[in-house]
Structures are given as structure tokens and as C-alpha cells.
Amino acid sequence: MNSIPNQNKALIQPLRAALYDIDPTALHDQLAAVFADDAMIRLAFPFEDVDGPSDLHERVYRPLLDAMPDLERRDYIVMAGAVDDRHWVGCAGYYMGVFERAWLDIPPTGHLVGMRYHEFFRIEAGQIVEMQALWDIPEVMMQAGAYPMAPSLGVEWRVPAPASQDGILTAPYDADHANASLALVSAMLTGLTRSREGHDKMELSRFWHPKMNWYGPAGIGSMRRVSGFRNWHQIPFLKAMPDRRGLPENRNLFGDGDYVGFTAWPGMDVTLTGDGWLGLPPVNRKLTMRSLDFWRCENGRIRENWVLVDLLDVYHQLGIDVFQRMRELTHMRQPNFSGEPL
């Protein structure tokens, strides 16, 4: 008998196919077929909450298709699992296409662009009843020469698929294997909560492979080895927000084979009391964060970690209008440019 995780991966396969070879009418019909009419759809800023599959098509996908008429979606991770009675499918990959017309006022390039995504779908009774998804919109801004915020401490590049090339899991679900991966990542996350006791108390080298890669969002960047993770992300992050706290009531953490996925909306609250992260000043402002993650385990260690954070939402909570700053930076490339300052 086919397991529920495999059934759920099969359920979204037609949607994945419709997003690979996109026909707008077929996509609309497929969204209507697989999503419940009252599905809770939560997307990255500036989209935020979307009112069902029709709104998802008209307000989100149609403008993106207008900007990139040859749009396609490529998965490199597809996994599934359950948290209590909540059954999830998690997908990671990137949208790509020729950027022909402006999108969210990001000026077009006429060239191929890519945008990472992490998308999680909760399934009940054969329908998607909830979607939590982050699209790396700052990555598109960067490719258009239009990102107006501080440069990344990590490296900006095309984040790769898993080194093992096995991220689209189709084998029969193995609960023991999934639980072993889940236990490793859970222990690592517990270790991170001891950061105030000192670096050694987190036991990073116990959990992470010596050649680990951490693939952060555009605006933070990617890094290799524990030392790179510490220098280019963790130390600035913890210095700026030492009180960061997970929100277990929102947490969905599940395993499938060597992979573990995490989604929460939001997953963390913090207070920005220190300097050094994203070039932001210590404004003593409370924030929530949306971070959607995937990990790949290898021989008892974590070898790769894909991370997307809704940085545009962080800036929005701080009263920073990234899109307006982008329009100022690119006003001569905006469609309504008149020669006058904005």
C-alpha cells in the first residue's frame, strides 16, 4: 500500500508539471483542481495572504507570466512527511525565464533570470488546504541591477541542487530513515538554542559536515564550512538579535529520506538590539521572521542547508520601503520615466 507521503507527492505532481510547461489556462484549471477553494495561501512580502487558488493565479502567477512569458518552474527537492496530523509536501527549486517586462516594478533585463522558491503544501482529503511559500524576490532585483540594500556578507550565485542529485524523493517512504534525519536536525536546532552559553555549547561540529554548505537568501548569501557559516551569518545575526526565540506553536519539521523540511508562519520572534546584520542599526524593535528551510543529511552529519528568509518582510516591519528605494535607484529604467525625479 502506498504511504501517505508518497500519495501526497503524487497529488501535487500534475501541478508541478503545469508549472514546468506553463499554459495560463491549464495552470488556472490545475490550481482550481488541487487547491481547496478556501485554502490558506501565505506568500512572501509584498503578496502576503492570497484569497484562494483563483486569486493565486490572477494576482501572483499571471503578472509573473506577463513579465516572463516563457516561465518555467524547476524543482530540485520534493519531499513529504507529517507533523502530528498535519501532512506536508515541501518543494525547493527556482523559477526561470527571460525577463521581458517589469515585475513588481523591477525593471526587465531581456535576459534569463532565476528566482529561488521554497514552497510547502499542507494536504487534507486529497486537496491542498494551506500553502506557505517564499520566493526570493531580492534575487531578481540583484539580477536586474536593482537591489537597493546592503551587499551580502556571503556569496551571491546560482544556489545548486543537492550534491547527491537525489532531492526529488520517489522511493517508498521509509519512516526509520526519515526519523533518523529528523532526529539529527532536531538535535542541531536544540543546540542552537544554547548560543548565549557560548559557541562551544552549540556543538556545531558535532552536527555539521566539515564541508557543509549553507545556502542563504539573496541579501545574506551562501557560505561553506562551519567557520563560513559563523563568520558570514550566525555571528552577525546573533549579535544583532541575541534574544531570538523560536515559535514552537507554528513549527512544522518533518523528514523524508536524507532530507528534513521546516516551515512556520512565522517561525521566530526577535528584538533588533545590536548592529551588524544587513547593515541595520540597533533600533530595539521587535520583529517576527519567516524562514523556510531544507537540510540534507549524509553519514550522520548535515551536509547542505537551503534557507530562505522573507527579508522584504523584515524591512517592511522596520518601516523600510525596499521597493520605493529600488524605484529611486532605477527611476530612469521605469516605464513611466519622465526625466523628472520621483
Predicted regions: what they are:
Residues 1-342:
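C-terminal and inter-domain tail/linker signature
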